[in-house]
Amino acid sequence: MIKVLAGAIKHPVNRTQTEFHEYWQSRHGPLFAKTPELRKYVQHHSLPESYGGTPKPTLHGASMFWFDSLDVLRNPPPSPRLNDAVRQEDQVLFEWYVGSSRYGAPGRMTLRETVMADDRQLFDRTPDWPLGGKRTSIVAQERVIVDGPTTPGMIKVIWAFSRKPGLALDEFQEHWHDVHGHLGARLPGLHRYVQNHSLPEAYAIRPMTHDGFSEAWWDDLESLQQSRTSPEWDALSSDGQTLFSYPMAVIVARETVIKDTLAGGR
């Protein structure tokens, strides 16, 4: 099983931030969830109240996608026609994309083509420089450090990062897991901690903007802030200075599950 992280920044003019989040969750997400080979899909919408704290979100959100293997990305299966993927029983989704012929004839357009057209009017895909802060794309395998239970109401922080110049990928991943991971596991109030290590073979398949990402869960923003002022957080941050390039991409959110076909929910 592989995971893909895709950062999200809203289109600069098409919607307010509130409208962006609503459309992403109610239209674009369910549309992409029709992709047959997609096993699981979770959206993360950065919380408005988190922008005044630390860590502060740098993105409006992020999506995570689960696929069976890297072969799905290497050799994507043919995409179904839109009117085969989205049916009348899908009601609102059908009327929005199929009934309206929103991006073209639904009998000719594929689901993938429709998703991409919808993507362009929802997210910031402008080529204006600087580009670094706009892009977050990582193909990885997860390594669970703290295997605790979570609930939908918990706060989740995602950090996406690149290794410090001079570190080979294997050196970076070894220290991240064996040293940094153990430091992170000691954070007060932490319920679950997952590292996601980029796959070396994936770099040749699609461009990756970072070398990995971490996911960490707390009960609420107050618990996160209490953890941030702890000696354990200071030790983690000090080690991070030897490991990561800065700034990182950051999302502070709650999980919104759009699709889940995996047994046990993880």
Please place each PLM-identified region on the residue numbering:
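Macromolecular interaction modules
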Residues: 1-266
